[in-house]
Structures are given as C-alpha cells and as structure tokens.
Amino acid sequence: MVKKRQKDISGIEQKIISLYAKGMTTRQISDTIEEIYGFEVSDGMVSDITDRPLPQIEDWQNRPLDEVYPIVFIDAVHFSVRDNGQIRKLAAYVILAVSLTGHKEVLSIHIGEDESAKYWLGVLNELKNRGVKDVLVICADGLSGIKEVVNAAFPQTELQRCIVYQVRNTLKYVGAKNKKEFANDLKTIYHAPSEEAALKQLERVTEKWEKDYPNAMKSWYKNWDVISPIFKFSADVRKVIYTTNAIESLNSGYRRLNKQRSVFTSDTALLKALYLATHEITKKWTMPLRNWGRVLGELEIMYPDRLS
C-alpha cells in the first residue's frame, strides 16, 4: 500500500476503480485518494478513469454463452437514477446461471423500468442470440408476464417461482410476533416430500392462520402451478433451486452501492458500478456447487437428451 504523502501513484487507477465498485461517488473517491496519497484528483479524472472499463462492459454483455444451462435465476435490485433533474426508480435485472460444470455465472445485467412481457421477451431472446439454446429451469419472482414469455422463448423450460421471495412476500402480511412461527409453518410446505404432502400442509397452514392473516396465503394458491415443480426433485436439486446464496451474495454487494450513494448520476454510472461490483464478487466463485455431480446426474435422468 502507498503510504500517505508518497508520490508513487502506480496502481492508483485500479484503486479508483476498486473504490467505485464499492459504491463510492466520484467526490468520495477524490477525497479518499487525497487522504491516502496526499494529492488531489479531480472528479473529472475519476470519472474518466471509471469510464475506461466501458468497452469491457460492452464485450461482457455481448460475449457468447453456453448452449445449455441447467438452472437460471432472474433477480431484480432497485436503484435511484437522476435524469434531467428528475429522480427515476430503475431496476437492475440480474441473470444468474448455474453451468453444466456446476459453476455460478452472471450472464447479463439489464437496467430498465419496464417489466412488461415485451421487455422480458427481449431479455430472453438476447440470451438466445448469444448462443443459449436450452434452459431446464428458470427461477424468478413474480415478474409481470414472465410465464408466457418463458413459454414463448424456451418452450421446454420449467418456470419455478423463487421460494425465498414467495416466503418473504407472505411474511409481509404477518405481524412481527408471529413471523418466526409462521415461517416455520411455511417450511412444512416447501420441504414436503411430495406435492400431495405439500398441498396437505398448505391447507393446514392456511386454516391455522387465516383468521389472523386472511390474505397471507392467497398467493400460494394463485402461484401453485409455478411453485409446485420443485416437489419432483430430490433434496440436493431443491437446495440448488431454493437456496439463493449466490443471489444473496450479489445482492449484498449491490446493496452496498445503495448505501454509499442514494442516487446515481446516470444509467451509465449505475451500469459501471454494477459491472465492477459483479466482477469483484464473482472473482471468488471458483468452485462448483456442493454435490453438483449428484444434482447433474438427477437432472440428466429427469431431462433426457437435453444436457448432452
């Protein structure tokens, strides 16, 4: 590390990019560099340096992808962006996949405010244009029109409602004093050994709580067709599908961006920060998922001729 007041600035650009990836504004970075190195770096210079990865970002967003991914997750993180003096709420849609080797990979990041079926068809068609021919399971929250779009883009693909978000949405209706007990009751549904057993638990949980929280369980019945696919899988496969450690590790990094700055100056500034944060997080993703050999073996049996 360069000591304070030392004039050797080798590595300073990488330091600036690293600070930007942590969510610092150009002003905060300028102040930090002055504190560490003892000389001023203008906001404009910081901005120029953080613009340098833009060609890499474009290449990354357009890079060829594998032909087949066993599991793909779609997640959204929300940010505020300034546009002509107005503050817009935008979502960053992160497409995360598990490859045939069991490694996690961020396929793309899309920034937008439109969640229409047309928007999602464009997102999935972009994956196809980059080489993806098949996905076994897509896990997503209740995104508008996603079911119809998945059927159109990847007709053989199974849509699985994200269990973690289903649970979170349910618990929004529940009082603080009952959240823990209610959450444990919900586990009896999605940990059930079969769909038949899960439906019995669904009825039991609904009857137990409907007097106090009449709206809490409605979405389970409404979304059952996209919740229920998980019950045909073993515990190993289920764990991959409803354990969102990879998504959560990404989100924790993205949330740091929101903590550091409440508003991004532009869509480009947000995309730069997301890409650089993603790069830092995914550098640690060197190992395949636990028990991936067993998971892949089961998927090959359940989806014959689609993983070869």
Regions found by a protein language model. Name each.
Residues 1-22, 38-48, 117:
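Basic, short loop/linker segments at the boundary and entry of helix-turn-helix/winged-helix-like folds
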Residues 1-7, 52-139, 144, 148, ...:
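RNase H-like nuclease fold core
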Residues 6, 37-43, 62-66, 83, ...:
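Conserved, non-catalytic sequence blocks in retroelement Pol enzymes and Pol-derived host proteins
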Residues 13, 26, 43, 47, ...:
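Amphipathic alpha-helical transducer elements in NTP-driven molecular machines
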Residues 24-71:
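Electropositive nucleic-acid engagement tracts
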Residues 137-144, 149-185:
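Conserved beta-strand -> loop -> alpha-helix junction used to position metal-binding or nucleic-acid-contacting
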Residues 155, 188-308:
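Acidic/histidine-rich catalytic cores and adjacent linkers
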